[in-house]
Every structure is written in C-alpha cells, then in structure tokens.
Amino acid sequence: MVTVVDRVTDRRLRHPEKAHRPDTSVQKKPDWIRVKAPTSQVYKETHGIVRAHKLVTVCEEAGCPNIGECWSQRHASFMILGEICTRACAFCNVATGIPFAVDENEPERVADAVARMELKHVVITSVDRDDLADGGAEHFAKVIYAIRRKAPKTTIEVLTPDFRHKDGALEIVVAAKPDVFNHNLETVPSKYLKVRPGARYFHSIRLLQRVKELDPTIFTKSGIMVGLGEERNEILQLMDDLRSADVDFMTIGQYLQPTRKHHPVIRFVPPEEFESFAKIGKVKGFLHMASNPLTRSSHHAGDDFAILQKARDEKFALQR
C-alpha cells in the first residue's frame, strides 16, 4: 500500500486534504486479486520511454494493479495536464492540490512516445483541471491532433473529466474526433457525496449522451468500481442509465483502497458476480462489457476497441 506522502518529495503531501483523517481498516485481498510483480525487459523499456519523454501515466499515478501486464505488452495510458488534480475523490490516489501551468510541449512529447512505442491503440486521460477556463479541453484536442500527425495508424481513446461548468469544452474534444470517448461514472449515485463529491451523476450521464449527439460515429464508454457499499439493484439501474445515453461499452472492476486515508473497501466482490454483470450488460444492449475484479478503464483497451468495431459492424449488418 502506498503512503499518503508524495513519492517525489517528502515535503509535499500527496493528499493534503486527507492527512488529518483517521486511518481506515484495510482488508486482506482475496486470492483472485493477486498480480505478478513486473520484471520483463519490455516493461523496463516502456518505463524508459515514458521517463525519456518526461510523461506522466495514470498507470503509475493511480497505482493500477495491471501495470506489469500492460507495460510488458507496450501498453500505456498517458495522463496529460500535469499530475496534480483539483478535486479530491475518496477513491483516487492521484495527487491533489494546486496544479502547475499547462505544458504546451506535452502534445508533441506524447505523440513522439506513441510513435516510438508503435502503439496500435493509445489511451489519453487527465487530472481534473477546474482551474482552467475550458477544463483542459483544448489541450486534449492538441494531443489528439499531434498523435494523428506522428502516428496516423494509432487509434485514440480519451478518458476525460466531466468538464463541469465548462461550456463548449466537450465540443472541442469531440471535434478532434477520438475513436473512443470514455468518461467514468465511478460509482452509483447514492455514493457520490462520499466517494466523488466534486461531480454530479446525471451531469456525467448527460455528457456521455451529448457525445453521441455531436458525433454518433465515436464509441462511448464508461466504467464503475464495485465494493464501495453499493447495492446490486443500483448497479443494474446505472446500466440502464448508461444505455439510455446510448453508451456502447461499460467496464466494471473491484475498488482497491490506495491508502488508509482513502475510502475503505466495503466488500470484495467475487468473480462470479462480475461474470453475471457482464451477461446482464450484453442483454441490456451494450456492444461490449469488460467485467472482472482487475478490470480498469484502460486495461486491454486496444483489444476492446477491436471487439467494439466488430460488434457494431455485426449490429449494422443485422439492421440492413
């Protein structure tokens, strides 16, 4: 388990808003959560490319359990707009506080790394930047355009913040035409006040719906964590809400507590329940469902994109 103190310097707290909270209990992880430590040469090469281009990855910042597997396959999810978030969600390990100025050279560095790694599919995400007039939307667009120039065969997936109170921001990102637009709901609405207090559930639903209205050709995607105390019927209702917004793809994974200052794991959901959600999601009309304890938004994103394309082609063929 990581510490609440920033890895870069002992003088800056990673989560200052959580520093004085009492420690919460930490449950022992069940066997189905175990992952192997990263040791491969390709993992080291991926790490070297990320460092050489002075880039930030959500794989590291969020403490993703799949980093060893993904980096060993040259898969990486780049986090733009800095590494300090303006919000303080109870589940997230990304550092919080006052961000630095936007790095205008970042789009070219990201594109260079994508080209060098010869990525077939790349995921671009960011911290929340409530301090920026457009929430960072223009920067997202610049990154997309830079990748299109330097790695034209690479498909692009964006995982965006909610752009709350940022009129016109969503339109800027959609106009840049990512192949997949992902925005995570994270949890059921009854848990928002404690888990995701800076966001609004139905604003996020509307954001996803608006993407389809602006450009129906873009795949839409959203994900949640389970194990935060939600009820099964709440998850099923959330699925219906996403389908009402015409969302194509849903991910469901187990919440893992980053530190003792974060929201505790209320329950480790067994694999068979994840399998059940996957089956129900397909019945409800999602083109694809990724649902297992170690599922994360960017995990197997390239493979999932291929599945989405095939599923949509088959759907259109049946409608002819």
UniProtKB/Swiss-Prot annotation:
Q: In its keyword annotation, does this UniProt entry include Cytoplasm?
A: yes
| Sequence segments annotated as region (Disordered) | 1-28
Q: Which InterPro entries match?
A: Aldolase_TIM, Elp3/MiaA/NifB-like_rSAM, Lipoyl_synth, rSAM
Q: In which pathway does it act?
A: Protein modification; protein lipoylation via endogenous pathway; protein N(6)-(lipoyl)lysine from octanoyl-[acyl-carrier-protein]: step 2/2
Entry's EC annotation = 2.8.1.8
Gene3D superfamilies, per the entry: Aldolase class I
This protein's cofactor list reads: [4Fe-4S] cluster
Q: What is written in the cofactor note of this entry?
A: Binds 2 [4Fe-4S] clusters per subunit. One cluster is coordinated with 3 cysteines and an exchangeable S-adenosyl-L-methionine.
**UniProt keyword annotations, A-Z:** 4Fe-4S, Cytoplasm, Iron, Iron-sulfur, Metal-binding, S-adenosyl-L-methionine, Transferase
- The protein's name: Lipoyl synthase
Species of origin reads Bartonella henselae (strain ATCC 49882 / DSM 28221 / CCUG 30454 / Houston 1) (Rochalimaea henselae)
- Tell me the gene name: lipA
